[in-house]
Each structure stands twice: as structure tokens, then as C-alpha cells.
């Protein structure tokens, strides 16, 4: 495939993203500068979140995405996935619960690291 053909595919993907969501996330904008990176990344995103063969319904998928983005502290991803979740009929209470689950997982992860250090530091006391 020529560089021009790759650029054309990348531009079509960007247009589809903008048409679907009303904006193009910064990550996609930057990655699209290198079609060899952007095209497979966009395909993976579509497979993970929008595939016709997915086992999870869109509401559940986007609740998972909100929880994961929350756990990672990815502010812009929380907003983007939250917007998709709301469009998939997720209620405010459901969204808040997913955010709590993600927050809790992040909290226990940091506690896990910290408390292991604590145990190591004071194991003989």
C-alpha cells in the first residue's frame, strides 16, 4: 500500500470518528500523523468498542470503558467514554457506580504497593 493510500484510509477513519462522535480525540489526531500506527490502533478500538460480533451490549461496554478510564485517571477518556455511555442510555446512577468501581480499583492498587513496602520495612517489628 502506498503512503498516499494509507493517508486516504487514515483520513476516512478520522472523518468516521468525527461523524460518529462529533469530535476527534487528541490521541487520534496525533496518531493519525503516522497512518502505520493509526490505522491498526483505530481498528483495534473499533473491534473493542463497536464490533458487530461483540458479546457485550453497548451500555455494558461503555460502562466498562468508563470504569477503566476512571481507574487510569484518564480525564479525557472518562469524558469521551462517559459521553458514549450516556448516548447508550446509561443512567447517571449507573455511570457513578462504574466510576466508583474504577476509582476503588485504582485505590486498592496503590494501597497494594504501599502496604507491601510497609510490611517489608517493618517485618521484624
Model-derived segments and spans:
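Alpha-helical scaffolds flanking conserved acidic
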Residues: 57-63, 92-98
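Amphipathic alpha-helical segments within well-ordered protein domains
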Residues: 46, 65, 82-86
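Short conserved catalytic/interaction loops centered on acidic-Pro-aromatic/His motifs
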Residues: 78-83, 113
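Iron-sulfur (Fe-S) cluster-binding segments and ferredoxin-like electron-carrier domains
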Residues: 81-92, 118
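Short Fe-S-cluster ligation motifs
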Residues: 100-117
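Short, thiol/selenol-centered motifs that function as redox-active sites or metal-ligating centers
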Residues: 64-80
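Acidic, glycine/proline-rich low-complexity segments that act as flexible tails and inter-domain linkers
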Residues: 1-58, 113-125
